[in-house]
UniProtKB/Swiss-Prot annotation:
<dbReference type="GO" id="GO:0006310">
    <property type="term" value="P:DNA recombination"/>
</dbReference>
<dbReference type="Pfam" id="PF02075">
    <property type="entry name" value="RuvC"/>
</dbReference>
<keyword id="KW-0479">Metal-binding</keyword>
<comment type="subunit">
    <text>Homodimer which binds Holliday junction (HJ) DNA. The HJ becomes 2-fold symmetrical on binding to RuvC with unstacked arms; it has a different conformation from HJ DNA in complex with RuvA. In the full resolvosome a probable DNA-RuvA(4)-RuvB(12)-RuvC(2) complex forms which resolves the HJ.</text>
</comment>
<keyword id="KW-0378">Hydrolase</keyword>
<feature type="active site">
    <location>
        <position position="7"/>
    </location>
</feature>
<dbReference type="InterPro" id="IPR002176">
    <property type="entry name" value="X-over_junc_endoDNase_RuvC"/>
</dbReference>
<dbReference type="GO" id="GO:0003677">
    <property type="term" value="F:DNA binding"/>
</dbReference>
<feature type="active site">
    <location>
        <position position="68"/>
    </location>
</feature>
<dbReference type="GO" id="GO:0048476">
    <property type="term" value="C:Holliday junction resolvase complex"/>
</dbReference>
<keyword id="KW-0460">Magnesium</keyword>
<protein>
    <recommendedName>
        <fullName>Crossover junction endodeoxyribonuclease RuvC</fullName>
        <ecNumber>3.1.21.10</ecNumber>
    </recommendedName>
</protein>
<comment type="function">
    <text>The RuvA-RuvB-RuvC complex processes Holliday junction (HJ) DNA during genetic recombination and DNA repair. Endonuclease that resolves HJ intermediates. Cleaves cruciform DNA by making single-stranded nicks across the HJ at symmetrical positions within the homologous arms, yielding a 5'-phosphate and a 3'-hydroxyl group; requires a central core of homology in the junction. The consensus cleavage sequence is 5'-(A/T)TT(C/G)-3'. Cleavage occurs on the 3'-side of the TT dinucleotide at the point of strand exchange.</text>
</comment>
<keyword id="KW-0233">DNA recombination</keyword>
<keyword id="KW-0227">DNA damage</keyword>
<keyword id="KW-0234">DNA repair</keyword>
<feature type="active site">
    <location>
        <position position="141"/>
    </location>
</feature>
Amino acid sequence: MRVLGIDPGLTRCGMGVVDGSVGRPLTLVDVNVLRTSADLPVPERLVTIERGVEAWIEEHAPDAVAIERVFARSDVSTVMGTAQASGVAMVVAARRGLPIGLHTPSEVKAAVSGNGRAGKAQVGAMVTRILRLDVMPKPADAADALALAITHIWRGGAQARIDAAVTAARQQVRSRR
């Protein structure tokens, strides 16, 4: 399974692609951070993010997209930018018919480090170890995007298959009526 992990943000949007499956070694395909200038109007920044996500999906052909689930923080402007970038990423993936997994920060931290309250350094160190990298991905947005992809492969992939089976069973029951 190939997963594109997206750590959404209006200023820095981390994107990382990981190949692998449960019980098998995972492999880094690519990682980067898309940046937009705070000097630009928000709509232009969102278009930049949209084009960046589209380009990554086109280039890497992921089987699924994992996006950090937005949660409330005290800084409303940060939450708004994160939510806007997240929405753009979801629309781009949905337009292509890609399954989308939303994972909370604590779920991602727990998946890669065993501790839902792990710090950025610990998450980065574990991503480096899991993907057998020589150096830690930087900035933290890059490591977070890879952690999202890893989490989706380890957890979300199985959940997506369960959800698909339940949906298929429901449709089968409805068609018999």
